[in-house]
Amino acid sequence: MRSYGYTDGWAGDGSGRCRCSSDSIRRYRSRISGPLLDRIDLHVEVPRLPPQALRSGNLGEDSASMRARVVAARQRQLARAGAPNAHLDQAQTDDHCRLEGDDQVLLERAIEHLQLSARSMHRILRVARTIADLDGSAAIATRHLTEAIGYRKLDRAIGTASAA
């Protein structure tokens, strides 16, 4: 699902094209329902790249390397649970997405601060497990969990809008 940050489509562009007031942005974002957001695993903002970045030739990981990491991660998931992380039920998520003490506290604080549902919490855990798999890690590390929490960007935007 794609969503523009607000009505004119220039969210976060930095070009000065956006003329929306903060109230109109807040109203626009509040139209997205919480139950719908709960069902989206990754909320990612993809900014427009300047032409210089496109010409530099340094665009990150190449497709072949990325594909190899994805294939290896999927094999780990199938070997561990017999299914991809996205298809784990609650009991499987609890079993295969365990966190250490400090990370459990971090997740609980994020859930409270962002006012997330149990469904969102389980999605965060499955995404963190997937990030760990892509990293070749047997356990979910703090960096995997914080990255997964970071992908709840729309929850933060809506939470901020409803708090104002």
Residue ranges and their predicted role:
Residues 1-164:
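Basic, amphipathic alpha-helical bundle interface domains used for macromolecular binding and assembly
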